[in-house]
A protein has these predicted regions:
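Non-catalytic, conserved peripheral segments adjacent to functional cores
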Residues: 1-107, 126-128, 135-196
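Short beta-strand His + acidic residue motifs that chelate non-heme Fe in jelly-roll/DSBH
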Residues: 112, 120-125, 133
């Protein structure tokens, strides 16, 4: 029996990874990454950088991508809960513009592997969340781009958000930085030829 269950999402290139957790009176243990299991599942990746962020409830980050240096990402929540989203922006892909969203939490211990060629973002659902991710290429700030989090063409069903009003269902305001508020819609990026 493998040490993790690797589940292909409906969009090619996206995978949910569920670990096999060994738990007893001392606590628990599980593998968060096993190259042999990943390669056996057809996921041959090489990570160059690990990142960690902490966010309060209502923080929405994204939707980010790098044009010339696309990054694959293996993401998980170390504390709290997040709704994590990947949008297919691969030129010629039959699922271009479609998204997959997954809830990641410290409790479910799921991970989400996002192949290069996707825009990525997440919303913090708990009072606080610590988010960790491994990437396959280095961060290149001059190459960073993004798509509007509420682009109607993509139609992400963000949980616990009251429409596009900028608040969560419990009244918590969305916290989105100025840069992420200014990202264009996918259609505008297509017109400008960014995905050719």
């Amino acid at each position: 029996m493998g040490k993790m269950n690797i589940i292909a999402c409906p969009i090619d290139g996206l995978y949910v990874i569920e670990p096999h957790v060994f738990q007893d009176e001392r606590g628990y243990f599980y593998e968060t990454y096993n190259e042999r299991d990943m390669i056996a599942a057809g996921l041959d990746m090489h990570f160059v950088q690990d990142n960690e962020s902490m966010s309060a409830k209502g923080v929405l980050r994204g939707l980010h991508f790098q044009l010339r240096h696309p990054q694959g990402k293996l993401v998980r929540a170390l504390q709290g809960r997040v709704y994590d989203v990947a949008v297919d922006i691969r030129p010629g892909s039959p699922t271009f513009g479609r998204y997959c969203g997954v809830e990641l939490s410290a409790e479910n211990k799921r991970q989400f592997y996002i192949s290069p060629g996707f825009a990525h973002g997440y919303l913090t659902l708990s009072k606080r969340a610590v988010f960790a991710y491994k990437v396959t290429d280095f961060y290149h700030p001059e190459d960073e781009a993004g798509i509007a989090w509420n682009d109607p063409q993509i139609g992400i069903a963000w949980p616990e958000i009251a429409g596009n009003e900028g608040i969560m269902a419990d009244g918590t305001p969305l916290l989105i930085n100025a840069r992420d508020r200014k990202w264009p819609r996918l259609q505008q990026l297509q017109r400008e030829g960014d995905f050719e």
